[in-house]
Amino acid sequence: MIVMKTTQDKVLSVLQSVSGIVERRHTVPILANVLIRKTGDSVQFTTSDLEIQIRTTAELEGDVGNFATTVGARKLIDILRTMPSDQMVALETSQNKVILRGGKSKFTLQTMPAEDFPLVQESPGFGPVFSVPQKTLKDLLGQVAFAMAVHDIRYYLNGILFVAEGKQLSLVATDGHRLAFASALLDIEVPRQEVILPRKTVIEMQRLLSDAEGVIEMQFANNQAKFSFGGMEFVTKLVEGKFPDYNRVIPKNHKNRITLGRLALLATLQRTAILTSDKFKGVRLNIEPGTLRVASNNAEQEEAVDELDIDYAGDNIEIGFNVTYLIDALSNMSQEMVKLELSDGNSSALFTIPENATFKYVVMPMRI
């Protein structure tokens, strides 16, 4: 049976979309494979790592019929990458193997039974379906994902909190030193739901989401989240645990406010970061009416000083930050202007977008 017969670029694109979670070698060997299921004239591709399952369906010609098998995902992708994008390729069945043909090339690959592939059992308790544009969720993830913890023993910090309530979707991430919050409007009103998506899920979704038109549909259950977009279905387990009360962390009523160009501040921080200590990455901000001075030094007694002219008439403030935390936030914003709010040199700082309440970034000061 010819399972599919089409151009290299069509097959490769579909395989790459589902194979980001696949490891070349796995303690469960079949999880290094992609499940290929032919039903009529449609071909369905499924991958899993037991935490995440990704599935997509494509029309790739070939014989009409029913067939299923699993084959090494990375091997298949590596072979296809060596062929021209307009090369006609065919995948055929041959007893317990599959044969991939392209031009004068022929590759015979081992398979494992489709019935042995561990499909995720979907939760019966999913809430209502709601949606936002694909690009909106991609932007929200970009605004907060950098603040996720990495391998923190507080496992609930190694991911992003999704909160759906009313007609608002809010995303929050924190590693205990900084916190990023971003929100957008939903298409319908929903009851309050909170889930924590694992770090790996977030990274994979950022890879898959595009700026293309179209929406992403979401559903949450107690132990799973499901996303449907661009012909793909993405099911993931959730992180258990109680996320910190982010509303208590976000400061209110700072008396000192500065609005300045995001790119100018980013460039200043990137320059002064060069001479920070490799270990602590500290920069010192001196803020006074009309001037923001950024300074850094290191163990070799080298020093960098840079200044920005600002429209500011508040208190004189000296405060230290991990420069990486500031650069991360500014690099993941797209707006021209940013607002910095401070109380004094010992309290957390708040970055927002002027006239926009959908993004907030809190960063703790550090002693320098």
Regions found by a protein language model. Give the residues of each.
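Structural preference for solvent-exposed beta-strand-turn elements
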Residues: M1-I368
